[in-house]
Each structure stands twice: as structure tokens, then as C-alpha cells.
């Protein structure tokens, strides 16, 4: 069995959803960009938006419609506070949800943060052949 890495570099957009972060202190977004580039992927675009479902939906819809975008990673807005609206904003955009992703994410998180992992509404799916992953901030 070959152990060579046949990575196909992807063009990925990163969106941070936060009412308190700025480009200067967006540590989650910075980490995601560094991690995807370290694996050989390309940053297609990056944005930081407040917790506003209509702004989120508009930005992600634009990226989904762009044939040059292979994937989108959204960080933030997946909790249970009154302003957290990432799932409500983006689930309607999916053509297909990725069953089990949220459960797996919470199971892995449980090993590090215990029952606090239950506060995440992480999810993933596909829209217009673009993969979408929504993670806690």
C-alpha cells in the first residue's frame, strides 16, 4: 500500500462569525487559515461578520455560487446564545447535510472539554458541489 500523499489542493474560504472579534484578534480564523495553508490548500477568501443571519447567508451564498471555491469553513455562531444564528442562517443553503459530522465533532471535543462540547451545534454539508463546515468559534 502506498504511503504517498495525493493531496489535491483546494480553494477554501474562511468566515469568522463574531460580535466581538476584529481582524486583529480573530484567533480562530487565523488558526484555520494557517492550518489549511500548512496542508497545502489555498485561501480563496476570508471574512469576519457579526452574528447576523442575513449577512452570513449573503456572504456564504456568494461563495457557494463561485465555481472556483471548493470549500467553506465557518467558525463561530454555533452556540445557544440569543445572537448565535449560524445554523439557522446556513442550513437552508445546503443541498445535502453530512450526517454524523456534528456528532463526531462533539464526541472528539468531549475528550478535551467534557460536557461543554454539548454547547456546539457544529454541522457540515454540501451546496452546489461546495463543502461547508460550521464549527464553534
What are these regions (language model features)?
Residues 1-137:
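Non-catalytic beta/alpha edge segments that cap or flank active sites
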Amino acid at each position: 500500500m502506498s504511503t504517498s500523499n495525493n493531496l489535491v489542493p483546494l480553494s477554501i474560504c474562511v468566515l469568522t462569525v463574531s460580535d466581538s472579534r476584529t481582524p486583529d484578534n480573530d484567533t480562530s480564523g487565523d488558526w484555520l487559515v494557517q492550518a489549511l495553508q500548512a496542508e497545502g490548500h489555498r485561501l480563496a477568501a476570508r471574512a469576519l461578520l457579526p452574528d447576523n443571519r442575513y449577512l452570513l447567508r449573503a456572504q456564504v451564498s456568494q461563495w457557494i455560487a463561485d465555481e472556483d471555491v471548493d470549500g467553506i469553513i465557518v467558525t463561530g455562531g454555533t452556540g445557544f446564545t440569543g445572537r448565535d444564528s449560524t445554523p439557522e442562517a446556513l442550513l437552508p443553503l445546503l443541498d445535502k447535510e453530512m450526517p454524523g459530522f456534528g456528532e463526531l465533532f462533539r464526541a472528539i471535543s468531549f475528550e478535551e472539554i467534557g460536557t461543554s462540547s454539548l454547547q456546539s451545534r457544529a454541522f457540515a454539508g454540501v451546496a452546489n458541489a461546495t463543502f461547508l463546515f460550521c464549527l464553534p468559534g
